Amino acid sequence: MPPWPASYGVTGFAAHPAFTPAPYSAPHASQHPSFTRDLPPGRAYARRRAHPDRSLDMKRIALAALASLLAAQPAYAQSILRDAETESMFADMSVPLVKAAGLSPRDVRVVLINDDSINAFVAGGQTVYVHSGLLQAAVNANQVQGVIAHELGHIADGHVVLADAGIKPAMHITLLSMVLGLAAVAAGAGEAGAGLMALGQAAGMGKYLSFSRTQESAADAAGARYLTTAGITGKGMLSFFKTLQQQEYRYGVENIDPFMQTHPLSGERIAHLTADLQASPAWNTPSDPALEERFRRVKAKLEGYVMTPDRTLKDYPETDSSIYGHYARAYAFHKAGYPDKADAESRALIKADPNDPYFQEIRGQILLEAGRPADAIAPLRAATEGTRNNALIATTFGHALIATEDKANYPEAIKVLRVATGRDDENPFAWYQLGTVYELSGDTARAALATAERASMQGDHRTAAQSARYALANIPANTSDWIRAQDIAMAAQNDMDDNPKKYKKR
């Protein structure tokens, strides 16, 4: 039986630990938690250093000084959590807001990040990243919609692209202060020179932070407009800002310098938005009850996945016979190593609604990861069909078919996994499974093509080129698979030609 990949999460959620969207600083006494966006200045400056300049050394000194002030803590990797039900909820709750922002729903994604802080951000493109801690802190779906509306404001107004407009003036101030400071030091006025440099750094930082706060206020206003246009109440947006305000009180709002924040303080944001949101025709419109129900389910299963089993069982004791209780405990028992108890919780869910595909999914994956792939096939097939071949669920179904080690299941696995990769070609696990079943079926050429797809997606262009060339030599010419192999081989070779040092043999 093929081993379970270490990166594949338990029941429903799948973690991808290699994702590092941006350095992140956890809130502390001088940094209130709020919606964050954009790559931090340190990352933007690092990109600039790649371009030679006659004054490079001086710029490096200035940029390092400013970046050291702006970057509170070092970056760390953040993993994406993928779950079919959660992604479906995100898509449905964001579509009216995306349209209100003048964007295409097909181009905008909302992605869940495994991070317990209350945070959301954009980092280029049209993807909104939401931390798991934000979902846990939110009390309803309407609050999450308020967060998404704000982040869409950043996307629609091009704030990531415009970040240089705030960085450059700050850099120039810092650079000038360094020049004057070094000149003073050279003239023998060491203390005066150091003071000039320190003042310049503070001025540069203040310039950037002022620019950032202006963008945040603009995103708040845009988010409020999108909610109104979409006919969605802004009560959730205001109430979530009040949640953030409570965090500020916890840190001691009197100790927070409003001029040293990337975002306006939550009290200011509430004051600026309240009148407009309350004047909206949608203010007293109830939030969609079906969406709120889906949110409660997702929140319960998320707690079961990210929290310790003890914490989950405290919040959802076995006396809780609700759907949310069964959902959360299914994850908790599975994580704790009690497969029979986890299966019992999943069977209780199916008993409550046999036609719910996500209940079938969780049972199938519990059985699969408990080493019972043959038993997992029926519920996973039902889940795949019930979600019209959702790519994530279909990938798990294909995994189960392969894991039975029954050759009679391989043709169906190939069919299922080809559909899954066709709908979501950015899932490395799906490509891995497709390559595995092709190899087991004796089709080494298409196994190589699947390997090339996976390697290309992960930036391993040498492996991609080698695998694609093998596929080209063994797949009938001018077929769709042959053409795809040709595309990958050419793209990979171009990357290697453009970056010879990167691929130089050691």
Per-range role (PLM):
Residues 152-169, 187:
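Catalytic Zn2+-binding segment of zinc metalloproteases
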